Amino acid sequence: MKNGERILLCLAHMSGKEMGFIKEAFDQNWVVPLGPNVNAFEQDLERFVGQDKKVVALSAGTAAVHLALLACGVGQGDEVIVQSFTFCASSHPVTYLGATPVFVDSEADTWNMDPVLLEQTIR
């Protein structure tokens, strides 16, 4: 790797319509994580996953992790396995609920959680 060369973790996919949606949200003063665009997104996603499923859009990935942990019943004294190659928002909801994050290292070639180390951690 050359000095100063960046490794991008992901590239954003833009369809070209984003600026119009942003302008619409500002024009209608819906610049908070609610409003007609959020409602439409939730409804579209409910139709996609099936009408028997419910969808809730959240303002941040941290909020989504927190809600998922609550839905799983995670609480005081629990341990939650977390990938070590992550942003702190992956572990903060764990500690907020009184649980302990247990970090597992990643594979060098994929950057995904190492399944061998995961198995060792579970044992």
Regions found by a protein language model. Name each.
Residues 1-32:
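N-terminal "arm"/small-domain region of PLP-dependent enzymes with the aminotransferase-like
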Residues 34-79, 93-97, 103-105:
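Phosphate-binding glycine-rich loop
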